[in-house]
Amino acid sequence: HMPDAARVHYAYLDAGGIAPNVVQARATVRQLIRSPSLGGLSSLVERVRAIAEGAALMSGTRVTSRVFSAVSNLTENRPLSEAMQAEFEALGPVPFDAEDAVFASSIRESLSREDIADTFERLAMKPDYDMALCDFIAPLDRPFMGGMGSTDVGDVSWAVPTVQARVATCAVGTALHSWQQTAQGKAPAAHKGMLHAAKVMAATARRALTDPALIAAAKKAHESHLAEYPYTCPIPPETRPPVGEG
């Protein structure tokens, strides 16, 4: 048992051999462990280690493990988030055109209703199955509906006040790591979304540079978060890059 939002992915790097019905002399597996928070990640990693040790005990083998890489969860900075939301709303949604909508509609035909509904559910909104591209700005306050990505910006957010823009670049309902996302990666709509995100970021930076009160509030919020949730780097200090390893 583990939290619903946690994930444990794996891939066999070396199954030990091709003979069936034997305990192989060796095997290597890579585990990708994800949790919404650093504290949850730490306890889940220890649990996965305990499971591996239990499996080794049952099979009369030995197991060793090491961390190759890790990233922390992205922490919200409310003052910066509110500033970015205001700048985003002032700029408006991404200026997609009719040709963008036609291409996105062709992609949407390959998506399931569940994919499209999931996009709106994450925004706590009623699904619109006719919408090809996002023509609105998502509200700042919305419930966490699960699902997360991994980024080293997360660790940056524990070091300094950080805010991240989320801007539409593909058809509504497009799943991450899918061929549909790849197919749209260099489309004009994706380029427009990227440029719009840059404008939102630049406008937020301009506001921060010209508003000392915003900087002070962002720093205070960051310090308060660290006081309640101290930062511990998820990468052990003895970890070295796996240079030259297969």
Question: How should each PLM-predicted stretch be described?
Answer:
Residues 109-198, 216-246:
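Zn-dependent metallopeptidase/amidohydrolase metal-coordination segment
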Residues 96-104, 213-223:
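Short, flexible loop/turn segments with low-complexity composition
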Residues 32-40, 209, 237-246:
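C-terminal domain-closing interface element
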Residues 1-114:
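Midchain, well-structured core segments that form catalytic/ion-binding scaffolds
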Residues 84, 156, 201:
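Hydrophobic, well-ordered secondary-structure elements that form the walls
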Residues 1-6, 210-216:
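Phosphate-handling active-site elements
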Residues 202-210:
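Short glycine/serine- and small hydrophobic-enriched flexible loop segments
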